[in-house]
Amino acid sequence: MKPALLHPARALPSTGHIGRAATLALYDELSLTPKPGLVTLVDRGSHDDMDAHSFMRSLFALRSYFPKMAQAGSQGASFPVLERLGIEAEQRMLAATGGINTHRGAVFMLGLLCAAGGAVLAEQACIPGAAWLREALCRHWGEALQQRSLRASAPVSYTHLTLPTICSV
């Protein structure tokens, strides 16, 4: 059974739209306040090494990454290609922030969602909803993610947090 389409009457977004939405989501997260202990536009939270300015420098450095990930996903890029794009984006983020990790998790997870969104646009010609994104992520890069997760979690035995968990949600 195919997941339901979201807003089927709307014009389809482009990979650029997906990338801009990801960047805007990070800005919206920064703008959300109050967030005890976390950086906002008006507060450093519990961080003495980062503030809204470092987050904005990071966002500026990452703004071209998310559309690239969506484009790569739309072209069926392999996991190593996505990983390379992510590592390059992480390096730009760290250079822009003086080595401060403001968005490493977003580079990885939001980047993969952008790639999945690009894949759905290319394959289904629809606005991707959560179920479509999950299915594309599992189908295209699930095995590579599972192997990466197994390698990363082997010392602490989190093997239950792998592909079966992602794909069964």
Which functions belong to the PLM regions below?
Residues 19-24, 137, 155-158:
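Generic hydrophobic, helix-prone segments enriched in Leu/Val/Ile
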Residues 2-96:
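Generic N-terminal targeting/processing segments that precede catalytic cores or assembly contacts
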Residues 81-145:
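Gly/Ser-rich oxyanion-binding loop with an adjacent helix/lid
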Residues 160-169:
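Single conserved hydrophobic/aromatic residue that forms the stacking wall/gate
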Residues 142-158:
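A structural-propensity feature for long, helix-poor, extended segments
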